[in-house]
Amino acid sequence: MTTSSTMAAVAPVSRWRRPFDVWLDGIARGWGIPAALAVFVALWVAILHVAYLSGDLHPDTIEAWSLGRTLAWGSMKHPPLMSWIARAWATLFPLTDWSFHLLAMVNSAFGLWAVDLIARRYVGGDKRALLLLLLLWLPVYQFHAQRFNANAVLLPLWPLATLCFLRSFETRQLGWAMAAGVVSALAILGKYYSAFLVVGFAVAALCHPQRRVYFMSAAPWVSAIVGALALVPHAHWMLTSGVGPFDYALAAHGGVPIAAAATSALLFLLGVVATLALPLVILAVLIWPRWRDYAADLRSLKPGLLLLLSIGIVTIVVPPLVTIVLRSTITATWAAQGLFLFVLVAVCASTFSISRNAVDWLAALSLAATVLALALAPVHAIYRNATPFKEGRSYYDLAAQELDRRWHAQSAAPLATVSGDTLAMSLSFYDHEHPAFIAPNDGSFVSGVPPRAVLQKGWAAVCLHDEADCLLWIRQIASVVPGAQSLTFSVQPQLWGRPGRPAQVSALIVPPAS
């Protein structure tokens, strides 16, 4: 084969690689990572919008919005950060499914951006791209992130807190120390599970060769004081409300036999390993020709990477140990926001370059997989139209519209308040009048009966046919509240002319006092 024919054979490959090479060059110029994240957000919002045409928002997302309707420093179930963010988002965007899909993906993109802020301290453009691409092969930044809740809100906070702590440890500057305290406090206000990240900071610092220099400085103590001060309003709320920081978690996950707790802890660790498997296997394939060099690099990690690895190990090892001690259960999902540490260290540990050809191929494969997910999104929508979600998500909007019609057949006044389980909470989102949602276990209810002032303004309760406790509760209310009207109606989703599985909804309405 002549030289000219060889070049002709290679040319088509060069052409398909050219856009990816331009992108990789753009990372060093500052636009490559933001551009990739913008494409990521756009594609995944489109995927979620199509895939969930036959399903409404996840209850966790609706709960975040519902809690945010009242500004407070906490709630009976969660610390307040996710509800604050949902409230702020709802002031800028309409209350629609697509806007909260956008919130979820923007939050996820900020998490990836925060990881890149750490990575750029150790590696250049191609490896920063490699890290981003490997993180996208975790089931974290799309599937875990798509329900905006107390877990997802930590995706940007954990890497940001880690960056601030890393800079504080390295420089011992008061600015970074204060930032580490503030962002760590924000992470705890996102979910109390973030206390394990703070423990990781402390243990990693204690195990590091430069621990004496760090702890002899003001940095760790400034971080601790600033973080504690940032949590004072929330602590005051807990003291005055009577809600303990772990009441809900222990009620929902505690009280199991020690064997069950140990099994849960083991499954947690196995789940973490399984979640990390794919990106680490991909990386292993890429570095395999130089595995001896890579092994040597791992044995001589940079001090900063050693600190990050120590933090990651602590956040994986300590939670299952606490689970066994408290005799509770745990799920690997709770660790998702910290798994970036292992992928980051694995990529940044290598001192040799990774083939740009390999990075181009991984970028092309990642883009192709995302486009394939978009192409298959209608299949998921069709499947869910025939096989409803277990949370009842197929019926939220339909039930809200039908109850609204039934309500206004009885009263011209807007529905003021709705109570019940998940369906009732979703009604407060999907009803165009957005009635307030009050859970039946709210302290203002007496023996499950809403206060008289609530009933006089107009109140309703709704339950799906399989919510046995809810159905029993509304029957009890109907027997003691004068003027209560019981209703039963059927709702059936439709997707592209295909009828879905119908569901029965039971409702109780109390029109406002004249």
Question: Where on the chain are the PLM-derived regions?
Answer:
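Short helix- or helix-capping micro-motifs
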Residues: 40-41, 131-139, 143, 184, ...
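Short acidic/glycine- and proline-prone juxtamembrane loop motifs at membrane-interface regions
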Residues: 143-154
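Membrane-interface transmembrane helices that cradle and orient dolichyl/undecaprenyl
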Residues: 120-121, 125, 161-177, 350
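Transmembrane-lumen/periplasm boundary regions of multi-pass, lipid-linked membrane glycan transferases
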Residues: 198-303, 315, 320
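Transmembrane-helix motifs of polytopic, lipid-linked glycan transferases
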Residues: 102-123, 160, 164
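Transmembrane-helix signature of polytopic, membrane-embedded enzymes
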Residues: 115-137, 155-156
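Membrane-proximal, lumen/periplasm-facing interface regions of secretory-pathway glyco-
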Residues: 54, 328-332, 354-412, 420-437, ...
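Hydrophobic/aromatic-rich transmembrane helices and adjacent perimembrane loops
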Residues: 71, 306-309, 324-361
